[in-house]
Swiss-Prot record:
It comes from Bos taurus. Expressed in trachea multiciliated cells. GO terms for cellular component: axonemal A tubule inner sheath; axonemal microtubule; sperm flagellum. Microtubule inner protein component of sperm flagellar doublet microtubules. The keyword Protein biosynthesis does not apply. Its main location: cytoplasm. Belongs to the RIB43A family. It is found in: Cytoplasm, Cytoskeleton, Cilium axoneme; Cytoplasm, Cytoskeleton, Flagellum axoneme. The lineage of its organism: Eukaryota, Metazoa, Chordata, Craniata, Vertebrata. GO terms for biological process: flagellated sperm motility. Keywords: Cell projection, Cilium, Coiled coil, Cytoplasm, Cytoskeleton, Flagellum. This is RIB43A-like with coiled-coils protein 2. It comes from the Eukaryota.
C-alpha cells in the first residue's frame, strides 16, 4: 500500500488545478456566442436569478399585503355592523326607557288640572324677528329659521337647475368632441388617401427609373462586350507580332555580338548577355584554384598559430595552478597561526572576565552613568 506524501498531494493538486483551468479555457474559447459577442453569461444568469428572486419576493409581499387588506376590510365591516347594531339597540333602549319611565304625566311641569296647558301655551317665537328671540334665549340657530323648508326647497330646485345645466354643458361638450373626432377622422382619411396616392406615384416613378436603368445597363453591357471583343482581337494581333519578332530577333538566336556595349570591351548589356566564353571560364577556374591554394595555406598558418597559443595557454595555466597551490599552503599556515593566536586571546579574555567578575561585585550607581555624555563632543 502506497502512502501519499505531502509532495505527491501538492503535485496532484497542481495537476487538478491545471486540468480545471484547461477545461474552463476550452469552454470559454469553444463557445462561439461568448467569444464573438463577449457577454458575461455568469453575470447575466446571476442578474436573472436576482430579478426572479426580487419578483417572487415582491409578489409574496403584495399577496401578504392584499391578504392583510382583505382581513382588515372584513374586520372593519364586522366592526361597523356591530357598531350600527349597538347604536340601534341603544336608541331602542332609550326609547323604551323614555316610554316606560319618562312619560309626560310624570314630569314636574305637568299640571293635573290642565294637562293641555303646554300645548295651549304660545310658542317661544312667532317669527324669525320676534323681540323675544334674544341671543341669550337660544331659540334660533343657523339653519333653524321658520323659512327653513322653503329655503331648502329653493336650494334643491337651484341644485337641480345647476345639475341640468351641467348635464346640458356636458352633452354639448360630448357633441363638440364627437364633431372634432369626426373631423379628425375625416382629415386622417384624406391624409391617408394623399399618402397612398403619393406612394403609388413613387412606385410608378421607381419602376420607370428601374426600367431606364435596366435599358442603360443593357446598352453598357453590349458596349462592354463589343469593346472586349475588339481588345481580344487587338491582343491576339499584338501577340502574333511579338512572337514573330521574338523568332526573328537576336534573343532566341543567341548572337554573342548583341551583348557588346558601346562603353568598351569590358562592358556588356545585361539583358542581352548570354554567358561567358570558354577562355573566360578557364581563366576564372584558374583564379579559383589559386584562391583555394591560398586559403589552404592561410588555414595551415592559422592552425600552427592556434597550436602555439594553446601550448602557451597550457603552460600559463600550469604555472597559475602551482602558484595557487603555494598560496593555499601559505594561507593554511597563516590560518593555523591566527587560530592559535585567537585561542590564546580567548583564554586571556576568559581569565580577565573571571577576574573582573570577582573584582567588580558592586552594581553601577546613577553617578556612574551621569559622567558620560556631559559635553557636545
Amino acid at each position: 500500500m502506497e502512502v501519499a506524501q505531502p509532495k505527491d498531494l501538492k503535485e496532484d493538486f497542481v495537476l487538478a488545478k491545471r486540468r480545471h483551468a484547461e477545461l474552463v479555457r476550452q469552454k470559454r474559447i469553444f463557445n462561439a456566442r461568448n467569444r464573438i459577442i463577449g457577454g458575461d453569461t455568469t453575470a447575466w444568469d446571476a442578474q436573472v436569478c436576482d430579478q426572479n428572486i426580487k419578483a417572487a419576493t415582491e409578489k409574496a409581499r403584495d399577496e401578504a399585503f392584499a391578504a392583510e387588506m382583505r382581513q382588515n376590510d372584513k374586520i372593519a365591516c364586522l366592526s361597523e355592523n356591530r357598531e350600527r347594531r349597538d347604536r340601534k339597540n341603544l336608541c331602542k333602549a332609550i326609547n323604551d326607557f323614555q316610554q316606560s319611565f319618562q312619560r309626560p304625566e310624570t314630569r314636574r311641569e305637568f299640571d293635573l288640572s290642565d294637562p293641555l296647558a303646554l300645548k295651549k301655551d304660545r310658542p317661544a317665537r312667532q317669527s324669525d324677528y320676534d323681540a323675544r328671540n334674544t341671543i341669550s334665549g337660544m331659540q334660533k340657530f343657523m339653519g333653524e329659521d321658520l323659512n327653513f323648508h322653503l329655503r331648502k326647497k329653493f336650494q334643491e330646485e337651484q341644485n337641480r337647475e345647476w345639475s341640468l345645466q351641467q348635464q346640458k354643458e356636458q352633452m354639448i361638450g360630448r357633441e363638440n368632441q364627437k364633431c372634432a373626432e369626426d373631423l379628425y377622422l375625416k382629415t386622417r382619411l384624406q391624409f391617408d388617401e394623399t399618402a397612398k396616392h403619393l406612394q403609388n406615384l413613387e412606385t410608378a416613378t421607381r419602376k420607370a427609373v428601374c426600367a431606364t436603368v435596366k435599358e442603360f445597363n443593357k446598352n453598357q453591357a453590349l458596349e462592354s462586350a463589343e469593346k472586349k471583343i475588339q481588345e481580344r482581337k487587338q491582343e491576339q494581333e499584338d501577340n502574333l507580332a511579338e512572337i514573330s519578332n521574338m523568332l526573328r530577333g537576336d534573343l532566341l538566336s543567341e548572337n554573342p555580338q548583341q551583348a557588346a556595349s558601346s562603353f568598351g570591351p569590358h562592358r556588356v548589356v545585361p539583358d542581352r548577355w548570354k554567358g561567358m566564353s570558354q577562355e573566360q571560364l578557364e581563366e576564372i577556374r584558374l583564379v579559383q584554384r589559386q584562391q583555394v591554394q591560398e586559403k589552404l595555406r592561410l588555414q595551415e598558418e592559422e592552425r600552427q598559430r592556434d597550436m602555439d597559443w594553446d601550448r602557451r595557454r597550457i603552460q600559463k595555466a600550469r604555472a597559475t595552478l602551482l602558484f595557487e597551490q603555494q598560496q593555499q599552503r601559505l594561507q593554511r599556515g597563516l590560518r593555523r597561526a591566527l587560530d592559535c593566536s585567537n585561542l590564546s586571546l580567548a583564554r586571556e579574555q576568559l581569565l580577565q572576565k573571571k577576574h573582573m567578575k570577582e573584582l567588580c561585585t558592586n552594581h553601577a550607581t546613577e553617578d556612574y552613568f551621569t559622567q558620560f555624555n556631559t559635553g557636545s563632543r
